[in-house]
Amino acid sequence: WNNSVLVRSQNIDLLINLTKLKFVKSAIKAWTSPDSITIKYKADHVHDTFNPWDSIEGHKYGAAEEQIKMLNGIPLHNTGYKGRGMTIAILDGGFMNANTIPCLKEINILGTADFVYPKSDNFYNEQEHGTAVLSIMGARHPYVYIGTAPAASYWLLRCEDLQSESTAEEDFWAEAVEFADSVGVDIINSSLGYQNFDDEESSHTYNELDG
């Protein structure tokens, strides 16, 4: 889509040689090593079942009751609009424990893909924000938590590198969107945006934020 290629190399001569190719218009630095690396996220222990006090008696939506009421989602559910037949891709930085949390076990997850380099050695052991996003849409656990689209199908796509902020992440995001399109996704949920980077010269100005 961007008519571009993301290349990783420690050889500066490679960059020089690439710019000599007739079909290469330009080359820019997309990633700079950060001064420090944060400690990897570690998955916390997850209980196989909920505690009795986790349930909210009297309302099948549980802890999600107020938010779905606010969005007037209950009448939609009552008329059958629960996301059935829709495929949703979630683009995020990680989906920690999404494969073990009880109220997420009934979600129809079609697959996962990791677009961050290097790829995670454990897809479900990264940051938890994507798990929260998945839960508010897809959770199906009556009287504990029911999301807004519990009958939809989902792709979980990791494209955010939490160790650094660089323009390379824009390419990770674009690759994830291209993948989502290729597998027939109907809706993309992306909680990501890019403006300020570790290399300040790469940061976008306000005027560049044109959508």
State where each predicted segment sits.
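Autoinhibitory propeptides
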Residues: 1-68, 74-77
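Short, intrinsically disordered, charge-balanced linker/junction segments flanking boundaries
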Residues: 6, 109-112, 184-186, 204-211
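Solvent-exposed, acidic/flexible segments
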Residues: 11, 66-69, 126-130, 166-173, ...
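Extracytoplasmic/secreted envelope proteins and their assembly/folding machinery
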Residues: 12-15, 21-24, 73, 130, ...
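Extracytoplasmic/secreted cell-surface and envelope-processing proteins
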Residues: 17, 36-39, 98-100, 197-201
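Subtilisin-like serine protease catalytic core
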Residues: 26, 64, 74-169, 183-186, ...
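Surface-exposed intrinsically disordered loops and tails
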Residues: 50-56, 122, 203-210
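Short acidic, glycine-rich surface-loop motifs adjacent to enzyme active sites
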Residues: 177-207
